[in-house]
């Protein structure tokens, strides 16, 4: 939860020292072995990293299990990325015909991983502009999971996001 602009986990304030993570391996390419995942976690722990954002899509389900086991916090991001479309009036976030896509991609993320205690924040997507589709998707996620904050990096102070995180 967030209270007085402070992120709390189990009622206690936490200082996030985080990193973004893409599913890519120097040897296996887009196939990341469990051994490499564990190696990554151990390196992060040595560097005092305590949180990871699964940018810009959900990760291999084994990653969430390992984060539960090793005690890494997660911001679990849905696979919404459309920055090539533009952020202004062309943003897909503003077109009603893309609302179902916004919700379905977040539904897949949240319903797949909701039982992982390592997830402390849901992320609606990345660099897709801002509009009514994100407002309605935020409401949908909050209705399904009232226990976790929801963020969207294009959401400002007057937007539907629990965490202000501008790029």
Residue ranges and their predicted role:
Residues 1-44, 65:
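N-terminal carbohydrate-binding accessory modules
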Residues 41-44, 51-167:
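Substrate-binding/catalytic cleft of secreted carbohydrate-active enzymes
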């Amino acid at each position: 939860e967030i209270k007085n602009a402070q992120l709390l986990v189990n009622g206690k304030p936490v200082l996030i020292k985080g990193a973004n993570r893409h599913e890519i391996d120097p040897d296996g390419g887009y196939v990341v072995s469990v051994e490499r995942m564990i190696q990554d976690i151990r390196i992060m722990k040595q560097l005092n990293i305590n949180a990871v954002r699964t940018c810009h899509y959900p990760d291999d389900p084994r990653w969430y299990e390992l984060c539960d086991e090793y005690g890494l916090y997660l911001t679990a991001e849905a696979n919404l990325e459309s920055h090539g479309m533009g952020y202004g009036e062309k943003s897909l976030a503003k077109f009603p015909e893309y609302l179902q896509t916004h919700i379905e991609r977040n539904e897949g993320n949240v319903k797949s991983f909701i039982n992982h205690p390592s997830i402390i924040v849901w992320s609606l997507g990345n660099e897709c502009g801002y509009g009514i589709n994100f407002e309605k998707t935020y409401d949908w996620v909050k209705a399904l999971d009232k226990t976790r904050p929801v963020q969207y990096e294009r959401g400002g102070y007057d937007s539907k996001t629990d965490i202000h995180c501008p790029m």
